[in-house]
Amino acid sequence: MKHEGFHGRAGFGQRPALLVIDVNVGFTDPASPLVCDLEDVVAAIRRLLDEFRRAELPVVYTTVSYDEGDKVAAAAFIDKIPALLTLEAGSRWVEIDPRIAPLPSEPVLNKLFASAFYGTPLSSLLASAGCDSVVVTGASTSGCVRATAVDALQHGYRPAVPREAVGDRNQAAHDANLYDIDTKYGDVVSVDQVVAHLEELGAAHAG
């Protein structure tokens, strides 16, 4: 079935930020009940980190962790996904995977729910940095990546999602959510396309 009026292009924008969503040890270590297979995703994010840092563009990380008060605030979410209790504040599970560790200047925002915008200063950080768009990476495609892409659009930022730099526990969910994002909320692109855009921005600024 063909649906007219969908699959337009939002575009990258002139000052993108890289969002690294929940690539913490609790999602990458096989010993965790929340683990995703993110080996290839981590490699793709490392490449994007190199390019964004080279271009001196903003990078923002998120993690998920819960102290005792947070467990009350997020009780309904935790009841739905009891494995979230693994993400105890201060534990190794909430630390960013060391293969893509943040620089001291790169903020790591803690969130309690799916979207990186909900209950965090992310929108203010992006506005202060003069960003007009975001490149959303991390996990999981059907959960926090999708929620962040939708909220990015609703906050006025053009979202792009590099397909090699996001991952999920379920391939069908991954594919379906990338389709939905590309149809309605943002642009699903390749890592090569993101890198090419950053190179174009660099050439334009140099000129």
Which stretches of residues belong to each language-model region?
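Short acidic-hydrophobic, aromatic-tinged amphipathic segments that line or gate anion-handling sites
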Residues: 109, 186-194
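Active-site-proximal loop->helix
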Residues: 169-182
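A short glycine-rich beta-strand->turn/loop micro-motif centered on a GG-aromatic cluster
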Residues: 135-138, 158-171
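Internal catalytic-core helix/loop-beta-alpha segment
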Residues: 90-139
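Glycine-centered short loops/turns at secondary-structure junctions
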Residues: 54-57, 130, 156
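Active-site acidic carboxylates
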Residues: 1-103, 107, 198-207
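Short glycine/serine/threonine-rich phosphate/pyrophosphate-binding segments
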Residues: 141-148
